């Protein structure tokens, strides 16, 4: 069983990887992925051995709060921005108090500056009050940090909580010594770290605020889509408008769509017309004109006039629901490149705590001053600096932040990745296999000519009547041609479809019930064919005389022109060093002509579904990383076989199960865009990881004091600033993907 839920209380990648590690050890858990950024988890488990409630209890034991739905954040007295502003104000107050004697002129009264027991104590008490206020503003670090430590799952908050608490306790001890006159000399006099506590917390709060703002912006794509989802719709019942919940709509319901309202579910216009904003599907801002017979898709907005539509999908299976599911899965899943960071994060925090303790002991022994409290002060500064400067957040944010921003960028291009692995793998593709009809071509073959051995209207009636039972694009072209010429469409029975060949049905022909067949030449038993010299898609119409013999009645010649700009986009793809193939069920002449015209390297014609599978299998056995690009209707087996499957979809044509990448703008440029975006994203992730590893590799030793003899020591305050800047730099670097642009050359 697969389930998705939310987890509150996570602060860094050590939290998410700790949950994965803990639950992953359970025999009944098959797979689990936890996303820090959108606080979600996807889990697959054996429902015969456990249930979701038991899994929730396991997570709660680790100190986190699992929930089936993400509750709204509790409204606090102070907003995040106000809390941050107060933290900055009180930090500056404490820092000024601690440095008052060094400032000239000082705004502090003389009574707080004199070097004596009373003034030092009074100054320190004011610093303590300011520090306690800042600690209260940043109390979440202590609540989450110590809770995680208690459950033996230490995280970034644990490091901050331990470091600042140690500094506070030491300062309180020093305050006690000053108050009771137990200090021995000037080295132990007034060694307070209240300003360090404040500065550390302030910098971390600033960094976290920047992270959260950036994360919220990256999550805007999904939030915007969810806002497009209407909760109710107007259902027509007995000529009356009734407002109903969208979840109650079933296929076949007649709905009224008013100007300015969103389409509730996928459907087809049956009365009226409208202009729809389909930018959430295609990325194109211009409204699309819709008339009777046109499809409309959930989440799109009606700009002008009202119309009636018939629902063709329920809410769960509508286009908008599938897009939201894809985005959620993409944001919740993990790329393979993130596994290294997860492994490091699992041991990072415990290792940092061990290093900090070791550094404290070493400095307590080797500190150069003879006074214990001086040595203790140096050792404590090193201890706090090591804890605070280490940044598991930079490692944890390196991959998911880039994936999050990349998915937002993809949606603006009309692209949707099924998961992070799809986004990661697209850049590795070296062979692309294209379907022809509906992918490279317009997908709407039109009849060029008809060659008939019987009365033309009778042939059109037979072919149109049978083909109306099919959803194939060629069938639609024939049906439309028959309707335009007012051919009467008959009732069919015993309709049978042979995938890749054609369709047959029993109908009235010359007063007798006959089996009429429509399809390619291989669908028929040997018959006398007409000599057709035209290039195009040949569709034969025949009558079954017996099980082994068919009579030819006529031939339709159709053509399907390439989409505008396809040739240029194929050239772009080939410039990336990618081999291209065309697999089509069309005849050799048409497929060859299309391949040569578009500059495609190789082709296979008359390809049945099994032929396509065999070719893809052959390419993969040669070591090729294969991407299949199809329309998602008749290519599901081939799409499933590929390393990366791209579906060129229009609304409800999308098959989420078959696709790794879905393009709603129905443009081959999307393939090039997906590959380039994948390349840019992985490059961005590698930059983030390089910075995160280098930062921790360099700054942790510096915080330990390895350059002490060169007079380089990092104070806890500077360590806090460096830690905040490291995670912020990763976030800001990820944001550069927002400016990603597809070059046309």
UniProtKB/Swiss-Prot annotation:
One of its GO terms (cellular component) is plasma membrane. GO terms for molecular function: ATP binding; ATP hydrolysis activity; copper ion binding; P-type divalent copper transporter activity. It comes from the Bacteria. Keywords: ATP-binding, Cell membrane, Copper, Copper transport, Ion transport, Magnesium, Membrane, Metal-binding, Nucleotide-binding, Phosphoprotein, Translocase, Transmembrane, Transmembrane helix, Transport. SUPFAM superfamilies: Calcium ATPase, transduction domain A, Calcium ATPase, transmembrane domain M, HAD-like, HMA, heavy metal-associated domain. Cu cation binds at residues 12, 15. The active site is at 435 (4-aspartylphosphate intermediate). Residues 105-124, 173-194, 367-379, 706-716 are extracellular. It holds the Pfam family HMA. Residues 1-83, 145-151, 216-343, 398-685, 736-745 are cytoplasmic. Its EC number is 7.2.2.9. Mg(2+) binds at residues 631, 635. This is Copper-transporting ATPase. It comes from Helicobacter pylori (Campylobacter pylori). The lineage of its organism: Bacteria, Pseudomonadati, Campylobacterota, Epsilonproteobacteria, Campylobacterales. The gene is copA.
């Amino acid at each position: 069983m697969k389930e998705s839920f939310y987890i509150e209380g996570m602060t860094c990648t050590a939290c998410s990887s700790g949950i994965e590690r803990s639950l992953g050890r359970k025999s009944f858990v098959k797979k689990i992925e936890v996303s820090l950024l959108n606080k979600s988890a996807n889990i697959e488990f054996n429902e015969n051995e456990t249930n979701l409630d038991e899994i929730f209890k396991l997570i709660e034991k680790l100190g986190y709060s699992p929930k089936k739905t993400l509750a709204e954040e509790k409204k606090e007295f102070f907003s995040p921005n106000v809390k941050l502003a107060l933290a900055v104000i009180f930090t500056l107050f404490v820092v000024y108090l601690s440095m008052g004697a060094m400032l000239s002129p000082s705004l502090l009264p003389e009574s707080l500056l004199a070097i004596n027991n009373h003034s030092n104590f009074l100054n320190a008490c004011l610093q303590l009050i300011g520090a306690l206020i800042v600690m209260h503003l940043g109390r979440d670090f202590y609540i989450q940090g110590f809770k995680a430590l208690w459950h033996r799952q230490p995280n970034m908050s644990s490091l901050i909580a331990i470091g600042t608490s140690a500094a506070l306790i030491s300062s309180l001890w020093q305050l006690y010594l000053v108050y009771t006159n137990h200090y021995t000399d000037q080295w132990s006099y007034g060694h307070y770290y209240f300003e360090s506590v404040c500065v550390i917390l302030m910098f971390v709060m600033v960094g976290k605020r920047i992270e959260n703002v950036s994360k919220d912006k990256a999550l805007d794509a999904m939030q915007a889509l969810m806002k497009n989802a209407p909760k109710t719709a107007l259902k027509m019942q007995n000529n009356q408008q009734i407002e109903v919940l969208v979840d109650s709509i079933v296929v076949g319901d007649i709905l009224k769509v008013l100007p300015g309202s969103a389409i509730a579910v996928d459907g087809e216009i049956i009365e009226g017309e409208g202009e729809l904003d389909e930018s959430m599907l295609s990325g194109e801002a211009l409204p699309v004109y819709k008339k009777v017979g046109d499809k409309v898709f959930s989440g799109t907005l009606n700009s002008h006039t009202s119309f009636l539509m018939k629902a063709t999908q329920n809410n769960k299976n509508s286009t908008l629901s599938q897009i939201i599911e894809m985005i959620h899965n993409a944001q919740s899943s993990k790329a393979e490149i993130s596994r290294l960071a997860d492994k490091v994060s699992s041991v990072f925090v415990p290792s940092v705590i061990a290093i900090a303790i070791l550094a404290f002991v070493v400095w307590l022994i080797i500190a150069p001053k003879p006074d214990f409290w001086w040595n203790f002060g140096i050792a404590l500064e090193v201890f706090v600096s090591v804890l605070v400067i280490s940044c598991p957040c930079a490692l944890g944010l390196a991959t998911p932040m880039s994936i999050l921003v990349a998915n937002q960028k993809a949606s603006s291009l009309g692209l949707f990745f099924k998961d992070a692995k799809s986004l990661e793998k697209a850049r590795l593709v070296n062979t692309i296999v294209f379907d022809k009809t509906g992918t490279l071509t317009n997908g709407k073959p039109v009849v060029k000519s008809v060659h008939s051995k019987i009365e033309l209207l009778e042939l059109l009636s037979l072919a149109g009547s049978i083909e109306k039972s099919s959803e194939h694009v060629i069938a639609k072209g024939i049906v439309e041609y028959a309707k335009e010429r007012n051919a009467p469409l008959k009732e069919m029975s015993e309709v049978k479809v042979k995938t890749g060949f054609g369709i047959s049905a029993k109908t009235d022909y010359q007063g007798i019930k006959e089996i009429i067949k429509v399809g390619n030449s291989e669908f028929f038993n040997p018959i006398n064919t007409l000599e057709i010299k035209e290039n195009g898609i040949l569709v034969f119409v025949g009558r079954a005389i017996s099980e082994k013999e068919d009579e030819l009645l006529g031939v339709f010649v159709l053509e399907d022109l390439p989409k505008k700009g396809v040739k240029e986009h194929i050239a772009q793809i080939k410039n990336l060093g990618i081999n291209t193939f065309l697999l089509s069920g069309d005849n050799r002449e048409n497929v060859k002509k299309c391949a040569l015209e578009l500059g495609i390297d190789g082709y296979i014609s008359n390809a049945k579904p099994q032929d396509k599978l065999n070719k893809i299998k052959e390419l993969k056995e040669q070591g090729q990383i294969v991407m299949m690009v199809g329309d998602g209707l008749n290519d599901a087996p081939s799409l499933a076989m590929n390393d990366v499957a791209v579906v060129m979809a229009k609304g409800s044509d999308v098959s989420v199960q078959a696709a790794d990448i879905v393009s709603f703008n129905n443009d081959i440029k999307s393939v090039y865009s997906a590959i380039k975006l994948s390349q840019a994203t992985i490059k961005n992730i590698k930059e983030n990881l390089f910075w995160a590893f280098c930062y921790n590799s360099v700054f942790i030793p510096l915080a330990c004091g390895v350059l002490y003899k060169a007079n380089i020591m990092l104070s806890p305050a500077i360590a806090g600033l460096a830690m905040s800047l490291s995670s912020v730099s990763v976030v800001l670097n990820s944001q550069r993907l927002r400016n990603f642009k597809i070059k046309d050359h």
